[in-house]
Regions:
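Structural/interface elements that position substrates and couple domains in central-metabolism enzymes
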Residues: 1-183
Length: 183
């Protein structure tokens, strides 16, 4: 989307030299909002899966089995839960919408809260498991924090929830052996 018709024409002319797919003509405001919408939608979908994992943990239900069964319905496609949301797009872009439209973006705002909380929750789970191990075995556990990046095959740790989890675990470890592994 360009600032006006002429700039849109120039952009399409430029990108059509190397883009194989369809180039869609729109204005710059809609184009920007489209990118924010794509990333916010993903954030909301991830938050739903993460919220289910929190509920299932308290209810004693295997979240993986639950999602697998629910996804057998033809109109259901629940994502897999994780330790939050990372990266410079999905974890950040929703804030552009919520800052400009706070009253209208309740679901987007809540999704950010859920996904941010999930990293805190995971850190607490690891800390509690470490404490339990130490009490039962009278020695400090050896911990491997594996996969700090927010997705496979990248070296980008921006907004990675695993980075937060690792920091919190290291702060509470009292000299436990912690190995940080990024394959």
């Amino acid at each position: 989307g360009g600032m006006n018709e002429a700039s849109t024409d120039k952009a399409i002319e430029f990108y059509s030299q190397f883009v194989q797919g369809t180039l869609h003509r729109t204005n710059c405001k809609t184009a920007e909002m489209c990118k924010l919408t794509e990333n916010s939608s993903r954030d909301v979908q991830i938050a739903f899966a993460n919220e289910l994992s929190l509920i299932c943990d308290k209810a004693g239900i295997n979240v993986w089995e639950l999602i697998n069964l629910a996804n057998k319905h033809p109109r259901v496609n629940i994502l897999q839960p994780g330790c939050g949301v990372g990266g410079h797009c999905i974890a950040v872009d929703p804030y552009f919408i919520t800052a400009d439209f706070p009253m209208e973006s309740k679901i987007i705002s809540t999704a950010r809260e859920i996904n941010n909380y999930k990293a805190f929750w995971c850190a607490e789970k690891v800390q509690n498991a470490m404490l339990k191990f130490e009490l039962e075995h009278h020695c400090k556990p050896v911990i491997a924090m594996m996969g700090l990046a927010f997705k496979p095959d990248i070296d980008d740790l921006r907004e990675a929830p695993a980075k937060y989890i690792t920091t919190k675990v290291m702060q509470s470890c009292n000299n436990a052996n912690i190995y940080i592994v990024e394959p």
